[in-house]
Curated annotation (Swiss-Prot):
One of its GO terms (cellular component) is endoplasmic reticulum membrane. It is found in: Endoplasmic reticulum membrane. Residues 62-68 are extracellular. Residues 1-32 are cytoplasmic. Heterotrimeric complex composed of SEC61-alpha, SEC61-beta and SEC61-gamma. Component of the ribosome-associated ER translocon complex. Keywords: Endoplasmic reticulum, Membrane, Protein transport, Translocation, Transmembrane, Transmembrane helix, Transport. Necessary for protein translocation in the endoplasmic reticulum and multi-pass membrane protein biogenesis. It comes from Branchiostoma belcheri. The lineage of its organism: Eukaryota, Metazoa, Chordata, Cephalochordata, Leptocardii. One of its GO terms (biological process) is intracellular protein transport. It is a single-pass membrane protein. The chain crosses the membrane at residues 33-61. This is Protein transport protein Sec61 subunit gamma. Belongs to the SecE/SEC61-gamma family. GO terms for molecular function: protein transmembrane transporter activity; ribosome binding.
């Protein structure tokens, strides 16, 4: 019986902590959501431009090396 309690107790504690965390969480309001969405969009745009410029630089270098 002691082994069963030892096996089940961590799962029970995890479920209790998870339930408490979910009860404390709140949804962001419209202003906070827009701020997060804007920051994410700017991040995607910056990463896209970096990838574009890296590819733009590597295409001529690759053509010079391969010599097509």
């Amino acid at each position: 019986m002691d082994q069963l309690v030892q096996f089940v107790e961590p799962a029970r504690q995890f479920a209790k902590d998870s339930y408490r965390l979910v009860k404390r969480c709140t949804k962001p309001d419209r202003k906070e959501f827009q701020k997060i969405a804007m920051a994410t969009a700017i991040g995607f745009a910056i990463m896209g431009f970096i990838g574009f410029f890296v590819k733009l630089i590597h295409i001529p270098i690759n053509n010079i090396i391969v010599g097509s």
